[in-house]
Structures are given as structure tokens and as C-alpha cells.
């Protein structure tokens, strides 16, 4: 029986990958940020309607009827529990799992770098991330723009004040009428316009930080106290690829629980199953999360760009089709 057993990345690319990951660890060691290790599975998971999880079942002593477990889409919830327990600034390089796309820039199992800095807001974290990107990508300093500015400059529409009909007109100009016209959820429509219309136009020469996302897309970020229309959230793009997603972290347990419950209500409206809420995280927030900012970065995509490759299979040994 013939089989494709060889890695898709060359040995030289894998050596360069290892060197870059070593450099990332050194970056955090120099800043006295502690590396941590948290579970790949959990009894609860994310409620975000746009994230899809893998799940399995444990059957063993004390669990004769089985216990459902979810593979983590991010180590965020566990890392925040460490922060609340007094860990100080922390980072992690881990495997994350998302039951979504597989292709040029996606693999269901991928390597993620996530870190949290106590006493930072999202702007100060962008400063630090810019330093890391310049180190790994050998690029210039990043450009920065608000979410509102990016939409107005690229698409000519305001994402905060434009009507659904105005957004759909822009979608039609992008050839997206079939998808956009029946869409009733504003944030889904905005994400479509961002991914197809905005992301390909920004961050071509240097990375682009986009910040102040709509408050309805806050997820686990604080609402901006100076402008409650927006959240203290940012994303990073380079050469048409989303690299990272960061927050000035929400520390209000009641507000976080309400957001999880709102997500699950929206899931039911969409015909999706509600997800089990992580009450361990809520308990950590009740105990007290220190004021901090955090970000999750896709390591495979970062290395792909650093090495001048155009497919993540070129920088991962055994991608999904041959795993």
C-alpha cells in the first residue's frame, strides 16, 4: 500500500521554524514573562457563534456514563485562571483546535502563541507585539487605524453608523450579494465585508493593527469608556492574512456571563447548540482578574510569512490531510 508519509515542510524549513520559536521564547524571557502550560481539553468551551469546536468523551473511573470534553480553541480561559491566582505576566505556545477550514492559511490543529501583560491596555500591548513582529518578520513598524477608519478608507462606509442596507450595497459591489442579501446579523455582515473587502487592502508593506472594534464584537474585551460604541479590541493583518486578535481584558464577571448567555441565545436563534459556559472562568473573574491585556497569535501563519512561503503546509510537518 502506497502512502504519503513524508512531511510537507522541508527539513530546512523545520529548522528555521524551530529557530524562530526559540527566538520568540527568548523575547519573552528577556521581558520576564513566564511560560505556562494549560490543558488542551476542557469540560466547557467558547460560546462564540463563529467558533466551532472538536469534542470527545472520557470514560473511566467515576465517569462510567462518560464525560464530554472539548478541545480548546484557545488557552485563554485557563490562562486567565492563572492570572487571577497570581501568576503575573504569562505566555504560552500551544496547540489549538478549531473544527473549521482546512487550506492555504488554515489547519484544524494549529500552533498558537498567547500572552497576557498585567498593567497593559490594548495600545501598550500593540507596542509590544509590534516589537515581536519586527523581530520575527524583519519588517518595519506597523501602521495603526481604527476599525471605523479602515472601513471608511477602503469601502467608503461607516461600520458603526451605516445602515444594514448601506452595508449590503457595499457587499454587492464586492460581488457578495448572494451571501449578504439574506443576512440579518449585522456583525456577520461586517465580518464578511472585513474579510473580503478590508483585510486584502491593508497591511501590505508593513503589518496593520486595526483597533476599536464595534462593541457588539467585544467578546472578552472591555468596552471603551470614552466611546461605548467600540470595544478595546484589536486585530493584526499582514499581506492579507489575519495574524492575531487582542483585548484589554474584561474583568467584570457579571458582564462576561451575560455575554456568554447572549451568545448561547443567538446560537439557539440560529439553530445551533448552546455551549457549556466555563464557570471556572467566571469564578476567577469574581476572585479578581488583574487589569491586563492579552493577545492570541497564529504561529504557523507568522512563520509562513517570515520564511516567504505561501501555504502553511510548507512550515508544518504533517498537516491535516496526512496527519
UniProtKB/Swiss-Prot annotation:
The keyword Cytoplasm does not apply. One of its GO terms (molecular function) is ATP binding. PROSITE patterns: AA_TRNA_LIGASE_II (PS50862). InterPro entries: Aa-tRNA-synt_II, aa-tRNA-synth_II, aa-tRNA-synth_II/BPL/LPL, EpmA. Substrate binds at residues 74-76, 116, 249. GO terms for cellular component: cytosol. Keywords: ATP-binding, Ligase, Nucleotide-binding. ATP binds at residues 98-100, 107, 242-243, 298. It catalyses: D-beta-lysine + L-lysyl-[protein] + ATP = N(6)-((3R)-3,6-diaminohexanoyl)-L-lysyl-[protein] + AMP + diphosphate + H(+). Its EC number is 6.3.2.-. It comes from the Bacteria. GO terms for biological process: lysyl-tRNA aminoacylation. Belongs to the class-II aminoacyl-tRNA synthetase family. EpmA subfamily. With EpmB is involved in the beta-lysylation step of the post-translational modification of translation elongation factor P (EF-P). Catalyzes the ATP-dependent activation of (R)-beta-lysine produced by EpmB, forming a lysyl-adenylate, from which the beta-lysyl moiety is then transferred to the epsilon-amino group of a conserved specific lysine residue in EF-P. Homodimer. This is Elongation factor P--(R)-beta-lysine ligase. It comes from Vibrio campbellii (strain ATCC BAA-1116). The gene is epmA.
